[in-house]
Amino acid sequence: MEPDCSKRARSGWVRTAADLPTRPFTDRILGVATNLSKVSVLTLDYAEVKPRMARTTKRTYRAVPGSGVRRIWAGGQPSLSGGRLARQGFVYYAFDGWPIRDLARSFSAELAQELTEAENEVRRLNDDPPRTQLLEAVARQLLRSEAVASSRIEGFELSHRKLAEAAFDPEDTSLNARAVLGNVRAMDEAIRFASEQLDLTVTEIRTIHRRLFEGTRDAAIGGVIRNSQNWIGGRDNPWGARFIPVPEDQVTRLLDDLCRFAARDDLSAIAQAAIVHAQFETIHPFSDGNGRVGRSLIHLVLRRRGLAPYYVPPVSLILAANYEEYERGLTTFREEQVEEWCGIFARAVTIACRGAGELATRIEELKARWREQAGSPRADSAAAKLIDLLPVQPVLDMRTVQDALDVSDEAARLGIARLESAGILSEITKRKRGRAWESVGLFALLDSFERLVATPTGGSTPMRRAPRPTRRPSKIAAR
């Protein structure tokens, strides 16, 4: 009788030789497997049958990190990585998923206190009327900050200036810019859905994913749930992978289970968002874009629960700045140490809220300086309205101003001219037609904010570079 290899190795260790089942082509396993950080050798005796000849061959394979579901990389095909090993094949383990629908809602006193503190910070951010009004004015730019940070976790580097230019002129953008714009669209979709107070469905998850890839060269994979094994890290095979998600035949069942858990209202909204995100990362239902969709679900859960009706703090900024702790937290969740992961997430939310409050204060101060520079324009003037618009639309042209402020061509022209002469706007096209301007000071402020949250907290070293100070304006094509 074969040993049961479907159980999860809760400590993160791959099964030992004694635990592995016998297969027709793996008669004996002589070595032992490994843990998640070190790779040991597996030696297999098996019969290799070829036409007109049969022989028994001993080959040395390695075990790829993972746990739970034993799988075989068949090999026999050219490989961009892994060399002879990938061509010969090897044994690896996919994570054996576990349901969360009925996860207990009770937590330790220490975690309950951290969750309460995080929830209070989110409420304070949304309930303070003056601050909320300001955050709503800049929410679009901060959502882009969240998208930049979330995309940076996936390896896409883009400055706030470049993203603003891409949003202004989507047709003339780099592939990285389009990818980050897709992340903004995905978060927009999550927020739109949450505002309708509907329960999360697999269909909506696919819609968010589809929005992520709209307008990119990978648009064809948008919304398509995978039908084969995937892995995180490594290259074109599981060798060297940091984590191997659940097998493809578990994806649909676990997504349905995740949606049922997301519909619950009997536990902390912060804990619920943390668990939904970690479980989605563990399922990894798509061939690409899972992390960005998973972080969009944080917004969806917190808005749906009513904790953050106006503004979700930029949690991805904190997770990206402390990426090592983020990865460790996801690993502990997969080992069913749910409390440790929820604590990491709750602390990230608390820091993000406080950082967002600091950013709001700095933007308030910047707008006050702009008004002073512009000579204190009347509240109903195009110049005053334009100052309020700049945090949301830092790159603009005449048509943008006319549409956003509902003013005439002449009023828009005079408003732009007044702010340009005051040093608040700077032209970035240098053309007579198709002229565009950007706000002076906002990008430096946003970069400063990112450097602030990238500062180590609690002894943790940020795993990404803090953004460099803003340099001279770049040029963009005429619209």
Task: Indicate residue ranges for each PLM-predicted region.
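FIC/Doc superfamily catalytic core
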Residues: 4-6, 19-479
